[in-house]
């Protein structure tokens, strides 16, 4: 029998976007071909898809690291890079996805249900897409964004109409095998059932599913015994059935005390339910009681004795013997009636309306705050500035100048000045820290001296070609003047 795994922690990493291309069109008789660098391809995303043929999370137990392919780099001649293919990961029906903080992200129920667990990164723009009046042939391109990386917890919660709950060795597995074609492991020792067993039951022309889950002991809601491994698998059941062993020889146990103990555990577990439980709390689900093993004479007498007392709670009571196959048909049709009545009483599920929240006009999309780790420094946070920094190649001066222009147009520099930032102070955006120089890019017109360079970022102490030429002209002028003076002196 394959190993059953119903809870795993995985690491999902989506593909990164491809880098844009910085190239210039070269063709005979076309000296000004212009930029033709293509955009990078989008990175592949990781998508969970419910597959009815998958029944366990075992594959994730042995392969917890999942990564999607990255996008390809853009190329010249306006050729965009290929997008990375989305990675579709098959998960069982009833899988719950939680983030690293335990917050519910998705409840995957129903064949074909999809959920994007990690989004692929955007591809970087090529220099053809970055061309403008100021930059007719940009000597740079934007880098692709890294794909989303997440640590996720997957939990499997059995999807069944009826959940059988009871103490160990109460006969739950025997009952499932008697009313369905399921063949769970059956033995005469406690905790024989370690994994949920599902069976399909026919009630005339109708069918429903029954789940036999691991046995319950007092304190299961706090983790004793199989604890949450038991209780997790009954959250989705529409009807809960207490299977009571009327032939038990354990001292201090009787059908009434067993039912009270089971109900106490259900009540204690209900506040821990995560997310939206469409069927309501466990304490509100319909109940039925199966008094099992009445083929034993003493057990039959005990079942008859407590039957009326249990029925006073408003729960149907069924006397059953799986060995003699007695009372099975009334139980099957009684459960189907409870399921149909409960489901018909549930309100119709209305699809959630899409809520659009417009961004205010005066929302700049960033925030500047003092850096608590370093006096006099500042931290700029916001989706756009941080994305722009990730897309910038800091080995290219022209790309850095383009980033400075974008930040200035967004209003970052103006906000830094308002907060009292001084030239040379450290400014952190995302993972990068800069020495802020307001006179470098602030509102100055773009002056390009060559592809991949920005005159505003050149060091002022470096002597340029024009300065060297002027110095040589001055030296020649000085030499000529000195030579003329000497000649006049000799003639005199």
Swiss-Prot record:
Using the record's annotation, list all stretches that form the Obg domain. Answer: 2-159
Q: Which UniProt keywords apply?
A: Cytoplasm, GTP-binding, Hydrolase, Magnesium, Metal-binding, Nucleotide-binding
Q: Which InterPro entries match?
A: G_OBG, GTP-bd, GTP-bd_Obg/CgtA, GTP-bd_prot_GTP1/OBG_C_sf, GTP1-OBG_CS, GTP1_OBG_dom, GTP1_OBG_dom_sf, OBG_GTPase
Which residues does the record give as Mg(2+) binding sites?
A: 173, 193
State the EC number(s): 3.6.5.-
Q: Does the keyword Ubl conjugation apply?
A: no
Recorded GO MF terms:
GTP binding; GTPase activity; magnesium ion binding
Start-end of Basic and acidic residues biased regions: 453-469, 476-492
- Family classification: Belongs to the TRAFAC class OBG-HflX-like GTPase superfamily. OBG GTPase family.
State the oligomer form and interacting partners: Monomer.
Q: What is this protein called?
A: GTPase Obg
Give the species this sequence originates from: Mycobacterium avium (strain 104)
Q: Name the gene for this chain.
A: obg
